[in-house]
């Protein structure tokens, strides 16, 4: 099991739907979150992409320089960047970060955002272009290790003599992650990606999606790994966790929710449609209305696009829910919580010790009793100075 955290390059807050308690997007703050994730034992971090975010490649490059082992899941955007250029960027980042790059292929589903960036393809064409983009990207990086060039002619993209002179550290290329809920998305995942990501839906719905991607992969003689994107609200007791969930949306009003849902409804995204269906428009903002599966809460999606569900509960309950997803085949958990700095610590301290050994082995040090009886948070004892 791998556990990732999230870098909030679009801002952070204690509450959803209001500027109250909001934090400015600054490099100092993003650095705090990244260093915390690195120190606490998270496998990596997701860097979001889109017009509401800082540029993911610039942000990830800066944060790679202040972390040691943390991996960075960074977006490439078919239609908004050339595949050979994206391959060159990936190879350079992978080398300077000592092999810490992961690629997040983002087709996009916000029509207004895509058109603002100059992309006017419909849903089907976007996935066709994404498939061609990824074929070129993978071939160019694989060929770079031998100094070869690539020719490719497709419906949307073509290259002649494409090459990357300085290959990535990871072979044949950094692993590719990808999420999408439509049939074309599953076909693309089965053909080319390494890890398929789903947003946090109830386990039965997730199982159906994973089975479909497995069938698509089998058509190409491949296997695919799986990950899930979730928010987390964990406290020492169930009651405290649900109180924190209520507090997170306590500043929302009907107008704010309706305005956000109207924006989401215009998106050309099957995943966003499925997220919206979980809370039925948010007319009722009670636990009974928003707990769509045991401890799976749809309150975040009332005003946040994309991943809109959270695991809510005490440490043992949240760990058990994660194990239920793992039994379906989920290997990677990409998590976040508001505010991201404090919740990175809280989740790691409360839940990491309950997860499989692959996670526990990354914990920073042991808990010992110090010489005066106090509990120390590290197993490293400084040696006395030598005269």
Curated annotation (Swiss-Prot):
Class in the EC hierarchy, top level: oxidoreductase
Taxonomic superkingdom: Bacteria
Alphabetically ordered keywords of this record: Flavoprotein, FMN, Monooxygenase, Oxidoreductase
Reactions performed catalytically: an alkanesulfonate + FMNH2 + O2 = an aldehyde + FMN + sulfite + H2O + 2 H(+)
UniProt GO molecular function: alkanesulfonate monooxygenase activity
InterPro entries the record matches: Alkanesulphonate_mOase_FMN-dep (IPR019911), Luciferase-like_dom (IPR011251), Luciferase-like_sf (IPR036661), SsuD_RutA_monooxygenase (IPR050172)
EC number(s) on file: 1.14.14.5
GO biological process, one term: alkanesulfonate catabolic process
Pfam families (UniProt xref): Bac_luciferase
Family as reported in the entry's similarity comment: Belongs to the SsuD family.
Function per UniProt: Catalyzes the desulfonation of aliphatic sulfonates.
Name of this protein: Alkanesulfonate monooxygenase
Organism: Cupriavidus necator (strain ATCC 17699 / DSM 428 / KCTC 22496 / NCIMB 10442 / H16 / Stanier 337)
């Amino acid at each position: 099991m791998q556990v990732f955290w999230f870098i909030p390059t679009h801002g952070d807050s204690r509450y959803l739907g209001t500027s109250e308690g909001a934090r400015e997007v600054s490099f100092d703050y993003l650095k705090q979150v990244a260093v915390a994730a690195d120190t606490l034992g998270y496998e990596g971090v997701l860097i979001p992409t889109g017009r509401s975010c800082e540029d993911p490649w610039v942000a990830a490059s800066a944060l790679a320089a202040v972390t040691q082992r943390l991996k960075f899941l960074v977006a490439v955007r078919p239609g908004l960047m050339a595949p050979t250029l994206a391959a060159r960027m990936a190879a350079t980042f992978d080398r300077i970060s000592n092999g810490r790059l992961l690629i997040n292929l983002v087709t996009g589903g916000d029509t207004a955002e895509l058109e603002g960036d100059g992309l006017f393809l419909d849903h089907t064409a976007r996935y066709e272009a994404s498939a061609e983009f990824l074929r070129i990207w993978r071939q160019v990086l694989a060929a770079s290790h031998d100094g070869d060039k690539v020719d490719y002619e497709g419906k949307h993209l073509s290259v002649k003599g494409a090459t990357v002179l300085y290959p990535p550290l990871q072979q044949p290329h950094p692993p590719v992650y990808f999420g999408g809920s439509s049939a074309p998305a599953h076909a693309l995942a089965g053909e080319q990606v390494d890890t398929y990501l789903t947003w946090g839906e109830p386990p039965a719905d997730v199982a159906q999606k994973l089975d479909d991607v497995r069938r698509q992969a089998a058509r190409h003689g491949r296997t695919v790994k799986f990950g899930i994107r979730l928010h987390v609200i964990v406290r020492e007791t169930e009651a405290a966790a649900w109180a924190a969930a209520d507090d997170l949306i306590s500043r929302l009003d009907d107008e704010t929710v309706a305005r956000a849902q109207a924006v989401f409804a215009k998106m050309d995204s099957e995943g966003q449609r499925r997220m919206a269906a979980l809370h039925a428009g948010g007319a009722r903002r009670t636990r009974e209305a928003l707990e769509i599966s045991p401890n799976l809460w749809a309150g975040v999606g009332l005003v946040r696009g994309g991943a809109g569900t959270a695991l809510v509960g005490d440490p043992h309950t949240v760990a058990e829910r994660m194990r239920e997803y793992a039994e379906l085949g989920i290997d990677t958990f990409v998590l976040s919580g508001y505010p991201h700095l404090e919740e990175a610590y809280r989740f790691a301290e409360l839940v990491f010790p309950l997860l499989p050994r692959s996670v526990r082995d990354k914990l920073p040090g042991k808990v010992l009793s110090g010489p005066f009886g106090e509990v120390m948070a590290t197993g490293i004892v400084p040696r006395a100075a030598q005269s």
